[in-house]
Regions:
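Short acidic/glycine- and proline-prone juxtamembrane loop motifs at membrane-interface regions
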Residues: 145-155, 334
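Transmembrane-helix signature of polytopic, membrane-embedded enzymes
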Residues: 114-141, 157-158, 174, 315
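Membrane-interface alpha helices of multi-pass inner-membrane proteins
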Residues: 161, 175-191, 197-204, 220-224, ...
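Loop-to-helix entry region of an early transmembrane alpha helix in multi-pass inner-membrane enzymes
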Residues: 82, 90-112
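Hydrophobic/aromatic-rich transmembrane helices and adjacent perimembrane loops
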Residues: 156-159, 195-196, 330-358
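Perimembrane helix-loop-helix junctions
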Residues: 2-10, 196-222, 236, 246-250, ...
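Extracytosolic helix-loop segments that constitute the early lumenal/periplasmic catalytic or substrate-binding loops
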Residues: 49-72, 79, 86
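Extracytoplasmic
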Residues: 377-522
Length: 526
């Protein structure tokens, strides 16, 4: 029955090749995802920060109350951790590890992104080949220096794609309200996903001035209501989510250029297909552009009227490319903005519109290129990294043995790579991976006036740092664990009179190895 409902296009050899290649890729993706899903080690340097806030919710604590800051700190939205804590409470009788469960939620978000991409392509082309290829390409959204990282990224991408999907099908005011709600929800998942409002608004201008106006008004109303409630419930949220989040970013033009080069090199079949589709679809567009601001009798007419209605995904490709020129300079992320924002909408639009190309040979060449480059090269060599070898695992286990011996000595762990070990062994979590971000905020009277909680956090952090430095300078901490990125630097600890007794090289995800150090007072060592 299910097979009968699908109106398959007549497959040629290229169609079978694309379908088979996508199926094999998905199988490989599932196998490697399972490996990274159950890994007891961090899949990314700051992964535990996402677990830490979920833990706070499970313990009934307010993660955005300055009482808990520092050492706790989290700059992303709360929707993913809150959802995870609620679901985790429902299945508490299963006794599943929280890290494993949150990774599973993130992986589910990846699958949902692939599903909605495939659904949109299938709706527009009625081709299972194009739909399956879109599903496979979209799986890249889950990559963040490794697979199955417990981050809110994939949930944010799913809500972003769902917003575009629903916006394209707006018919009533209720539909507009739903799209506005999803738009605002995306901000509270991870802040930059709210950018989805731009392509939605632009597209509505080509459709109906009234709908565009309603969308803006409903979105503003929804945000004001949500912000009022959240500011009451979580006093420090907006200070952290806006002020601190903007302060942590360091930017590099060379970092952006490297990512654009990778995108151009391995996604050139999709990019070429995009240009061909846009040219063929809009080459005969009327040169007359009618712009009307009259909200009277023609309020249901578009603000900008063209002979060919632009596609919301084509607009999204253009908008997100411009956005990436800014976000892509952020040195804290490599390719993730491109994978999350640009690639999904690029895949959806190009594969939905590929049949506009009349020459089958050209279409086949682009499809084969897409499979070989955009899917397999990126997928197998970047999205699916090699497994951790026995030597790398032994490094982790040797460090765990050292920490097991130090547990009763008052050890303090300042490496986020070992934050889960600290939590599992009832030790304080002194650095969850984002604790260091507290110190990035610069003093500003304007910021203090608009976001008073930001000033409170800065003052509390200063007192906490002074107390910590006092404890170190008087050797009150017998054992300190840091790494090469820790905010407790090696130079500071050496000046304070601490010496390294052990150093271990640890692998986390696909990033270069991190070096973890064990420090004790030099006088004790001597």
């Amino acid at each position: 029955m299910i097979m009968q409902r699908i109106n398959f296009k007549k497959f040629n050899s290229v169609g079978y090749f694309c379908l088979g290649a996508s199926a094999v890729y998905c199988l490989i993706f599932i196998i490697y995802s399972f490996y990274w899903l159950i890994s007891p080690y961090p899949n990314e340097y700051r992964e535990f920060a996402n677990i830490d806030i979920t833990r706070m919710f499970l313990e009934g604590k307010n993660p955005y109350d300055t009482v808990n800051i520092p050492p706790f700190f989290y700059v992303y939205g709360f929707v993913m951790p809150l959802l995870t804590s609620w679901l985790y409470s429902l299945i508490s009788f299963i006794h599943i590890d929280l890290l494993l469960f949150q990774r599973l939620i993130a992986l589910s978000g990846t699958i949902l992104c692939g599903w909605i991409s495939a659904k949109e392509v299938k709706n527009q082309t009625n081709s299972i080949v194009y739909a399956f290829l879109a599903f496979s390409i979209t799986l890249i959204v889950g990559w963040s220096m490794g697979l199955c990282v417990a981050l809110p990224n994939t949930l944010g991408v799913f809500v972003m794609l769902l917003t575009l999907y629903k916006a394209k099908r707006i018919k009533t005011i209720t539909d507009i309200c739903g799209v506005s709600f999803l738009t605002i929800l995306s901000f509270f998942i991870k802040q930059y996903f709210v950018i989805v409002c731009v392509p939605v608004f632009i597209w509505l201008l080509f459709r109906s001035k009234k709908q565009a106006l309603y969308y803006v008004l409903f979105s503003i109303f929804c945000f004001i209501c949500a912000a009022s409630f959240i500011n009451y419930l979580y006093p420090a949220f907006f200070s952290i989510a806006i002020v601190h989040h903007l302060a942590i970013a360091s930017h590099s033009l060379s970092h952006l250029i490297k990512q654009l080069a990778v995108t151009g090199l391995f996604y050139f079949p999709l990019l070429l297909l995009f240009l061909l589709v846009v040219y063929n679809r809009y080459k005969n567009i009327s040169g007359k552009i009618i712009i009307s601001f009259n909200l009277g009798k023609d309020r249901n007419s578009p603000l900008i009227k063209l002979s060919e209605m632009p596609d919301i995904y084509a607009i999204s490709v253009c908008v997100y490319f411009i956005v990436i020129l800014r976000l892509g300079m952020h040195e804290g992320a490599y390719m993730t903005y491109i994978y999350q924002l640009f690639i999904p909408v690029l895949a959806i639009y190009t594969l939905s519109s590929i049949d506009i190309l009349k020459k089958d040979k050209l279409k086949n060449v682009v499809l084969i290129g897409t499979v070989l480059f955009s899917l397999y090269h990126i997928g197998l060599f970047i999205n699916i990294p090699r497994e951790m070898n026995d030597r790398e695992k032994s490094e982790w286990e040797s460090l765990y043995k050292i920490l097991d011996a130090d547990k009763t000595k008052g050890v303090q762990i300042y490496s986020p790579l070992l934050a889960k070990y600290a939590w599992d062994n009832q030790l304080p979590v002194w650095n969850n991976g984002q604790t260091e971000y507290i110190s990035t905020l610069q003093n500003s009277s304007v910021i203090s006036h608009i976001f008073p909680e930001a000033n409170k956090i800065a003052l509390k952090n200063r007192d906490w740092q002074l107390q910590l430095h006092q404890q170190i300078s008087t050797f009150q901490i017998p054992v300190i664990i840091t790494d090469n990125l820790s905010f407790l630097t090696s130079s500071f600890l050496k000046q304070a009179g601490y010496c390294i007794t052990d150093s271990v090289s640890l692998k986390a995800g696909t990033t270069p190895n991190y070096t973890v150090y064990r420090w004790i007072p030099c006088q004790v060592r001597n």
